[in-house]
Amino acid sequence: MSNYAIILAAGKGTRMKSDLPKVMHKVSGITMLEHVFRSVQAIEPSKIVTVIGHKAELVRDVLGDKSEFVMQTEQLGTGHAVMMAEEELATSKGHTLVIAGDTPLITGESLKNLIDFHVNHKNVATILTADAANPFGYGRIIRNSDDEVTKIVEQKDANDFEQQVKEINTGTYVFDNQSLFEALKDINTNNAQGEYYLTDVIGIFKEAGKKVGAYKLRDFDESLGVNDRVALATAEKVMRHRIARQHMVNGVTVVNPDSAYIDIDVEIGEESVIEPNVTLKGQTKIGKGTLLTNGSYLVDAQVGNDVTITNSMVEESIISDGVTVGPYAHIRPGTSLAKGVHIGNFVEVKGSQIGENTKAGHLTYIGNAEVGCDVNFGAGTITVNYDGQNKFKTEIGSNVFIGSNSTLIAPLEIGDNALTAAGSTITDNVPIDSIAIGRGRQVNKEGYANKKPHHPSQK
């Protein structure tokens, strides 16, 4: 039989105090909805239906054509939300997973185990449960003397005995699909919340003598539903440790997992070392044997093998093998550093292509430039690429020596093997094998300093 999935993503999430729909808040680089969607893939669903409502288009854009969508215009409870999928699924034969879009820690493995348990035990409904140290706020799983599930009781409807139960409903279920939609016709709003509870279908199945089971999670953390920023931070912490652990298993040294912020789609090669307080975001990819030292921050960066990045920022750039960056360097979007390049302390590079073995050791700005191989930038070099309205390009050949404190005013071309004298302002193209000097001639006026207040003779 086929598997199906319904993802509940219509809620506003008032306690988040945010303009974003709750499921759009991110955990480790992607939205909670995307985390859930990825985990759902483990059951190989023939169709996924996402129930949307608040700011529906934002939610729809996240999944695009990977899901069908149905609207829940009024928030009348989880049962009502599932009813919205009736037109898409009601006549289909198979098993339907129902899961909330704000449960980013649930794993695909657990969902696969849930489906297998449901099928193997021939249940009409199977509840995903967990044991909670503090079950307050959760629906409780009530069992009879034979350990069979008899019902789910919500917190506000639970009596004193039921509130002592530790086994909680995670809000994730598997149902026989056609039985689910038949039972939904019989639920009502006669409860403390005045809503259509999806949990009421469990009681309907039990009254009809149908088999209901429960599969208990091994890790309570997977059950976390995010309702506020506190829970969001908890989810982030758990996910961060999970990600760091997987990288360590794969041969990466993460010196302090508590302080490493690694997004879920980041790739890191073996023998690389991630020191404390490193942040790796987006689609960043790190090669083998690379060292990222304390405080480095990379966003959508492509980094090769045997690279050293010391307390620096790299954004949307390509760093080739053997490059050294930092400390305190800033590699801005659109930059490509070829093999063996050295970008030193307090150097900023933006939208530039830098050739092999080129060095900019300190206090330099290179913007909108194309630079050849074996170029040396002296300290204090500036490419002047912006006139207030337009950006202009600087082209520098190979084996060029740029003297310290040179100002290169674009558009400008400097040929191979050329050099600029220290302190020069270069406004014209420099031919191959030439030296360019663009500074005022020094004039010494002997004895002139005697008249100045700083001179000992004036004190």
UniProtKB/Swiss-Prot annotation:
User: At which positions is Mg(2+) bound?
Assistant: D102, N227
Protein family per UniProt: In the N-terminal section; belongs to the N-acetylglucosamine-1-phosphate uridyltransferase family.
Q: What does the record give as its pathway? A: Nucleotide-sugar biosynthesis; UDP-N-acetyl-alpha-D-glucosamine biosynthesis; N-acetyl-alpha-D-glucosamine 1-phosphate from alpha-D-glucosamine 6-phosphate (route II): step 2/2; Nucleotide-sugar biosynthesis; UDP-N-acetyl-alpha-D-glucosamine biosynthesis; UDP-N-acetyl-alpha-D-glucosamine from N-acetyl-alpha-D-glucosamine 1-phosphate: step 1/1; Bacterial outer membrane biogenesis; LPS lipid A biosynthesis
**The keyword Lyase is assigned to this record:** no
Species source reads Streptococcus agalactiae serotype V (strain ATCC BAA-611 / 2603 V/R)
**Keyword terms of this UniProt record:** Acyltransferase, Cell shape, Cell wall biogenesis/degradation, Cytoplasm, Magnesium, Metal-binding, Multifunctional enzyme, Nucleotidyltransferase, Peptidoglycan synthesis, Repeat, Transferase
Q: Where is this region: Pyrophosphorylase?
A: 1-229
> One Pfam family of this protein, by short name?
NTP_transferase
| Protein name listed in UniProt | Bifunctional protein GlmU
Where along the chain is the active site annotated?
H362
Q: Which SUPFAM superfamilies match?
A: Nucleotide-diphospho-sugar transferases, Trimeric LpxA-like enzymes
Q: Which residues bind UDP-N-acetyl-alpha-D-glucosamine?
A: 8-11, 22, 72, 77-78, 139, 154, 169, 227, 332, 350, 365, 376
- Please describe the quaternary structure of this protein: Homotrimer.
Which cofactors does it use? Answer: Mg(2+)
A cellular component annotation (GO) from this entry: cytoplasm
Q: Which GO terms describe its molecular function?
A: glucosamine-1-phosphate N-acetyltransferase activity; magnesium ion binding; UDP-N-acetylglucosamine diphosphorylase activity
Enzyme Commission (EC) number: 2.7.7.23, 2.3.1.157
At which positions is acetyl-CoA bound?
A379, N385, Y386, S404, A422, R439
Quick one: where's region Linker? 230-250
Source organism lineage?
A: Bacteria, Bacillati, Bacillota, Bacilli, Lactobacillales
